[in-house]
Structures are given as structure tokens and as C-alpha cells.
């Protein structure tokens, strides 16, 4: 009796160069989102690199209008916000966060594209959401959102004009419904 040769597979398994190649950039994973319930949520939305600086008067006019118009729509209530150079921080409450962020994203994208004279996406990725379950977490998140610009630039100001801490920018937000805010 003669022993036959064994053929090894040439695909699959761990080997050099295997797997999906990295695309680069910060990506939000496509995992199932946590249930919100009646807790507030800290949401961060990043813009694509070609989008102009969000902390300009022109961009503020567009984003402020979108935030004001969408503050109490799509099953979401916007409680606090801060606009940075290339991203937004939002503290929101509500049941249907996905629908609300989609609606807000459409408003912001249409306005920014019209301002820049272009078409296409402006959000870099999915939004990042962190559910704030304890009063301490809420307090820390609100402080982080409202003082984010001061923290990153080192400039000490009374209130950031491009955040909900400023009373001069003309955006009045609705009152929160959860007890933690």
C-alpha cells in the first residue's frame, strides 16, 4: 500500500497579509447601539476634511439654524451643544436617536453644501453616542461639552460663542425633560 500526499489549503487562516486592509481615519464601529431609555446621551459628530471650519460666522449661521430648527424634532430634544473646528458635541435626550441624527445630519449637510457651493457628504462617519446613566456622568459631560474649546485652545473666556453656554448667539434651547439634566 502506498501513502498518498496530503494537499494543504492555500486560503483562509492566519497568515501574512491576510484580512481586510485598513482604510485609515477614526471610524465608529458598526456595533449595536446601547438602549437609551430615559437617559441623556453625549453625541459626537465628525466632519470630513474638506468641510470648512465650523467655528466661522458663515458656518455658525447654517449650523445654528439647523440646531434651532431640529432642537425638538424627530423624537429628540437638544439640551446642550458645542461647535468645534471639525466636529460637534451634543447632549441630547429622546427615544429615537438614530432618526434624529439622520434628520439633523440632512439639515446640516444641505446648509453647509449650499454655503460651500458643493454637493456630497459632510459627516465623516457615523455619530458616536455615549449614554449618560448617572448624575455625575451627566455633570461631567455637560462641563466637557461647554468648556471643550477652552480646554483645547487654552483661551479663558466667559462663554464660548459657538456653544449653548453663550446667550449672545440667539439660539434658545427647550427645557430638558430628564431629571438628570
What is the meaning of each model-derived region?
Residues 1-86, 93-181:
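Short Pro-Cys-Gly-centered "Cys-loop" motif that presents a nucleophilic cysteine in a tight turn
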Amino acid at each position: 500500500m502506498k501513502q498518498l500526499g496530503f494537499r494543504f489549503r492555500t486560503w483562509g487562516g492566519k497568515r501574512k497579509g491576510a484580512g481586510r486592509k485598513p482604510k485609515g481615519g477614526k471610524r465608529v464601529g458598526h456595533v449595536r447601539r446601547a438602549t437609551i431609555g430615559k437617559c441623556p446621551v453625549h453625541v459626537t459628530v465628525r466632519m470630513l476634511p474638506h468641510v470648512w471650519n465650523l467655528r466661522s460666522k458663515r458656518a455658525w449661521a447654517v449650523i445654528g439654524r439647523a440646531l434651532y430648527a431640529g432642537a425638538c424634532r424627530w423624537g429628540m430634544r437638544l439640551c446642550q451643544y458645542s461647535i468645534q473646528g471639525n466636529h460637534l458635541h451634543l447632549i441630547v435626550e429622546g427615544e429615537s436617536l438614530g432618526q434624529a441624527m439622520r434628520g439633523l445630519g440632512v439639515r446640516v449637510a444641505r446648509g453647509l453644501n449650499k454655503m460651500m457651493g458643493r454637493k456630497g457628504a459632510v459627516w465623516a462617519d457615523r455619530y458616536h453616542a455615549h449614554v449618560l446613566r448617572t448624575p455625575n456622568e451627566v455633570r461631567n459631560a455637560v462641563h466637557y461639552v461647554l468648556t471643550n474649546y477652552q480646554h483645547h485652545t487654552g483661551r479663558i473666556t466667559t462663554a464660548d460663542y459657538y456653544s449653548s453656554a453663550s446667550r449672545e448667539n440667539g439660539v434658545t434651547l427647550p427645557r430638558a425633560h430628564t431629571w438628570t439634566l
